[in-house]
Design a protein with these regions (language model features):
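Short, conserved catalytic or adaptor-binding loops enriched in Gly and charged residues
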Residues: 135-143
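Mobile genetic element proteins and their domesticated derivatives, centered on retroelements
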Residues: 34-36, 75, 81, 100, ...
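Charge-mixed, compositionally biased segments that are often intrinsically disordered regulatory tracts
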Residues: 1-66
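Active-site proximal helix-loop segment of RNase H-like, two-metal nucleases, encompassing DDE(D)
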Residues: 151, 159-178
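Short catalytic/ligand-binding loop motif for oxyanion handling, primarily in non-cytosolic enzymes
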Residues: 41-43, 122-125, 155-158
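Conserved, non-catalytic sequence blocks in retroelement Pol enzymes and Pol-derived host proteins
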Residues: 64, 178-181
């Protein structure tokens, strides 16, 4: 389903905030980093696929076995081209907190990290505090200047582009029966 956002004052304010962050010249002391996540359905083949042969395409049965879900984080620093993509076993506040911890460690000399992300229920200071404790979780959150995209404004998050490329180039129409294979393939795609 495609949603058309209501262009109210809140939407416009958040949109203009994100666009203003993108418009700033590059500053290593205040990098702009975009974060997004994508749920992945894990499926196993019921019958082994038949590989391609000269003159014959590969064949894969449309029947599959459900094996749960996983999550993929995409992080992009648009001004430098740096990007990180990683698979996690689930979409939780703890996984989000670990990803933010990883991002903060990548920028040890930054005064603040401008983090553009959507307003998902786990994208909060509490997720970091629950994972790392009050002191470290609070410290990590305080290293960020958070810029939430407006509701139905995910197109403003440049990490969406990263995850779109990942979906086409890495996932394609392949099936991943477990998060370990998904992690290995994600790491190989990331290079």
């Amino acid at each position: 389903m495609w949603c058309v956002a209501e262009l109210n004052q809140q939407y416009i304010r958040k949109m203009e905030d994100v666009l203003a962050v993108y418009e700033k010249p590059y500053d290593a002391a205040q990098p702009v980093v975009c974060l997004d996540e994508k749920p992945i359905a894990l499926h196993a083949d019921v019958r082994s696929p038949i590989p391609a042969k000269p003159g014959k395409p590969a064949k894969q049965d449309n029947e599959y076995e459900r094996c749960g879900t996983a999550n993929v984080f995409g992080v992009v620093e648009p001004k430098t081209g740096r990007h990180f993509t990683t698979a996690t076993p689930d979409r939780s506040g703890a996984e989000f907190a670990r990803m933010v911890g990883y991002v903060v460690k990548q920028y040890p000399f930054a005064k603040t990290i401008h983090l553009v992300m959507d307003n998902l229920n786990s994208h909060t200071r509490n997720s970091l505090i629950n994972c790392y404790g009050e002191q470290e979780g609070g410290y990590l959150w305080d290293r960020l200047t958070v810029h939430y995209t407006p509701k139905h404004g995910s197109w403003l998050n440049q990490a969406e582009i990263e995850l779109s490329m990942y979906s086409r180039q890495c996932l394609g129409k392949r099936r991943f029966p477990d998060v370990n294979l998904l992690r290995r393939e994600t790491q190989a795609w990331r290079g």
